[in-house]
A protein has these predicted regions:
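Hydrophobic beta-strand segment of the Class I
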Residues: 132-133
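Conserved phosphate/anionic-ligand binding catalytic regions in large, soluble enzymes, centered on
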Residues: 137-138
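A short glycine-rich, Lys/Arg-flanked "PGG" loop and its adjoining helix->strand segment in the class I
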Residues: 201-215
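Nucleic-acid modification enzymes, centered on SAM-dependent nucleic-acid methyltransferases
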Residues: 1-125, 141-193, 204-207
């Protein structure tokens, strides 16, 4: 319930400093998302290995005839917790850092995370970046925003009050997404695929021009 959520958040805020509250809530939301990914009508049951496949294992979300039902209060939460903790440790290894225990007060490595449109990076000065690493979308191959909604609605419930600027809308923004999505251009007198491709190419051109400015 909403009252229970507020109480639990107040418990965290009373016990930990703000940065740690944000970190703990973020990790808990990732565990919750993984639980939903493994235990929904969109997850596929694989009888050969007696296991379930994640709903997001493919590039689309589809209802399954055969789906798993896992007890959320038993193995599911601990299984997903172990996966998230393992991923965190691997990321720390990748950047040559040690996983931070909850009582660590200071560390000398910092990372800045910003939420912004790739074609309007106003917070980055001209010629101030050494390298830009990106995995851009390719036309209509994957509808990222539609897939993101599967996780976004749960994260918004957990993190909406902690990171309000990241969860301003009920669902993800489909109009500004740089993909070719024909469903946005139906009944316009021109084949929707053609309009979707033009929209995608225009957005990608603006994005790469902005990246060039920053380099």
């Amino acid at each position: 319930s909403a009252a229970s959520d507020v109480y639990k958040r107040q418990q965290l805020q009373a016990e930990y400093e703000p940065d740690k509250v944000e970190a703990i809530a973020t990790y808990l939301s990732l565990i919750l998302d993984r639980c939903v990914d493994l235990n929904s009508r969109l997850s596929n049951w694989i009888p050969g290995v007696i296991s379930g496949a994640r709903a997001s294992a493919q590039h689309s979300l589809n209802l399954m005839w055969s789906y798993p039902e896992v007890s959320g209060s038993n193995k599911l939460w601990f299984l997903c917790y172990e996966a998230v903790a393992s991923n965190y440790s691997k990321l720390c290894t990748l950047i040559n850092a040690k996983p931070l225990p909850i009582d660590t007060q200071q560390h000398n490595k910092t990372v800045q995370i910003d939420s912004a449109s790739a074609d309007t990076l106003y917070h980055i000065p001209n010629s101030s970046v050494d390298a830009i690493i990106t995995d851009p979308p390719y036309y209509a191959t994957i509808q990222y925003a539609e897939l993101s909604d599967f996780f976004y609605v749960w994260q918004r419930r957990v993190l909406g009050d902690i990171f309000p600027n990241f969860y301003l809308t009920e669902l993800t923004d489909k109009d500004r997404e740089a993909v070719a999505n024909p469903s946005r251009f139906r009944n316009m007198g021109t084949p929707p695929e053609k309009l979707a491709n033009k929209d995608y190419e225009a957005k990608m051109a603006l994005t790469f021009a902005e990246h060039y400015r920053c380099l």
